[in-house]
Structure formats: structure tokens, C-alpha cells
């Protein structure tokens, strides 16, 4: 029985995330996706004192799952769960269209 798709023609080498290596290479050098830009913009508006914001689409480019790293003075003296709640609240509209979200928050070091 013949399989459908390009994988049927030649075996694909897969990277650590299970994606074809050519896809990983394309994504590594590509600029931010539309979804990454949108989430970054919302976070910049909601956390104007953030010293670092990094948004990465970890779903392979389809926009279903993101990893967010944000460093902001606004997280000072808040527990991790409270920091994550702040990020979730800021992105409540965007989250409706996502499958998952990884959040890493921190406070700038003096």
C-alpha cells in the first residue's frame, strides 16, 4: 500500500521535535510568524515595563502553541502563579485560538 505525501517518495530525517529537518532549518532562520508578532505586540502593550519579551510558535508554525518568556518589573513580589495569571489575563482573547501555552516569567536583576 502506497503512502500519501512527499514522505512516500523519500524517507525524511526528523529533528528532536519530530519535525522534518528541512522544516526546522527553514523555521530557524525565518522572521517571526504573524501569530508571534501579534502576541508580542499585545504583551508589549500590557507590560510596558518589560525588559525582555520572547514569543516562539512551538507548534511547527501553525499558531496552536506558543512559548512565552517575559521579564518585567511588574512581576516583582508576586508568586509565579500570579505572574502567569497576569500573562494569561493579558492574552485572554488570543488564548481562545490556541491549543497550549508555555509561560516563563522573571523579574529583572538589578
UniProtKB/Swiss-Prot annotation:
Keywords: Mitochondrion. Pfam families: BolA. It is found in: Mitochondrion. GO terms for biological process: adaptive thermogenesis; energy homeostasis; glucose metabolic process; iron-sulfur cluster assembly; response to lipoic acid. InterPro entries: BolA (IPR002634), BolA-like_sf (IPR036065), Mt_Fe-S_assembly_factor (IPR052275). Interacts with NFU1. This is BolA-like protein 3.
Amino acid at each position: 500500500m502506497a503512502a500519501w505525501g512527499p514522505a512516500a517518495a523519500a524517507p525524511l530525517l526528523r529533528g528532536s521535535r519530530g519535525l522534518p529537518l528541512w522544516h526546522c532549518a527553514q523555521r530557524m532562520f525565518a522572521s517571526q510568524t504573524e501569530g508571534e508578532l501579534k502576541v508580542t505586540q499585545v504583551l508589549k502593550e500590557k507590560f510596558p515595563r518589560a525588559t525582555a519579551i520572547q514569543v516562539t510558535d512551538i507548534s511547527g508554525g501553525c499558531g496552536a502553541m506558543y512559548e512565552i518568556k517575559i521579564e518585567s518589573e511588574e512581576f516583582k513580589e508576586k508568586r509565579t502563579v500570579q505572574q502567569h495569571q497576569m500573562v494569561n489575563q493579558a492574552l485572554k482573547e488570543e488564548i481562545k485560538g490556541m491549543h497550549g501555552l508555555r509561560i516563563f516569567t522573571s523579574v529583572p536583576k538589578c
